Amino acid sequence: MNLFDLPARMPCEASGLLLERPGLRIERIVSWGQRSPEGFWYDQEEDEWVCLVRGSALLSFERFDVLLTCGDHLLIPARLRHRVAAASENPPAVWLCAFGHFDSGRETV
């Protein structure tokens, strides 16, 4: 799969599994302006490393927001509640996401 070979526009996000190994899952997610439903928060058991490879997005945490543009990345520790407050539509937001249990680094929210 080429990261930039995008599926036709869909009413919901398109997620594709790129790699899965014990303790690690890597996905490509394409968003055409979708955001988390009002009142919904991700509260994951795994750490999530996100890299925005196209477009822009706004991630909301309980006490702050993070604006991501093309090339930005960060590590979201497990159990840190977050939601997608906004994602670009044209161009669509293309995410590369790795899920697992990682050591914290400077990129941690």
Report the location of each language-model feature:
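A short, N-terminal "cap"/entry segment at the start of jelly-roll beta-barrel domains
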Residues: M1-W41
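Short histidine-centered beta-strand/loop micro-motifs
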Residues: G16-L18, E38-Q44, F61, V66, ...
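A structure-centric signal for secondary-structure junctions around beta-strands
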Residues: G23, E46, P92-A93
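Beta-strand residues in well-ordered beta-sheet regions across diverse protein folds
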Residues: E27, L52-V53, S60, A85
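Short, conserved beta-strand element in jelly-roll/cupin
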Residues: D43-L59
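Structural motif
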Residues: S56-L58, D65, R81
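Short acidic-glycine-tyrosine-enriched beta hairpin
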Residues: R63-A78
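Ligand-binding loop in jelly-roll beta-barrel domains
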Residues: R79-R106
